[in-house]
Amino acid sequence: VKVDADTVLISEHLFDRIIDRFSSEPSLEVLSIGLHDFYTDTIINGLQISRNTVRWDFSKNSIFTDIPILDPKSYVFDTAVLSPAGEHSPNPSIPQAFHYGVHRGIKSIQKIHSTTHWANMQKVWHHFLQTRDVRLGFAVLGAELVYAGTFNRKDQDYTNPRMGEVLCTYKGMDAKQLEREIRRLRFLHWGFLPDDLRRRVLRYKRGKLDQNWDQT
């Protein structure tokens, strides 16, 4: 069972029910259980459980570290029975939210598996506009700085100080200031285009041309 550091489980019986699920379905190799996500306020693909026969390819320097080598027929994404298994990042700090945005921004411009992450960042943007929670604003700002070319895939590492240095330049911004800065960045970097066209332009420019794609 892979429980990320920013995930809080909410059921004391969850592990027993997971064991029962795998015992009753011998062909099941990977079970992913939906989590309630603070950023999007939706259920996201989150808690991943793998049978001990599952293998991963660690030879590639991939943004998507959780994708195993398996037959898709042996994979289940549960959004109804055991979901929500927990809360994803229920109370992030501003640096955590900013890092989330940068990381998801990089994921959303990849050659593959990018569409869902792009859609989720648009949900975070709308969630911010509804709630005015500055943590959501800083998450969107992080992604927009990826789209602006400020950050690349090397900058998302927690050991790289550059993300913190850039964040300091926005220190103390309130929701109104964040919205203004985000809208400015969006306009300057193809935000005037229809959403899906902007995604494809950024995927090509920031992803492929700026060499932020996974090397396959």
Where on the chain are the PLM-derived regions?
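Short beta-strand-to-loop element that shapes/binds the nucleotide-sugar donor at the catalytic cleft/hinge
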Residues: 30-46
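Long alpha-helical, hydrophobic tracts
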Residues: 1, 15-18, 31
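Donor nucleotide-sugar recognition loop
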Residues: 59-75, 85
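Activation segment
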Residues: 9-11, 58-59
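Short beta-strand-to-loop acidic/aromatic patch adjacent to the donor-nucleotide binding site
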Residues: 1-8
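C-terminal catalytic/acceptor-binding lobe
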Residues: 81-216
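Conserved nucleotide-sugar donor-binding
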Residues: 46-59
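Short alpha-helix within the catalytic core of nucleotide-sugar-dependent glycosyltransferases
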Residues: 11-23
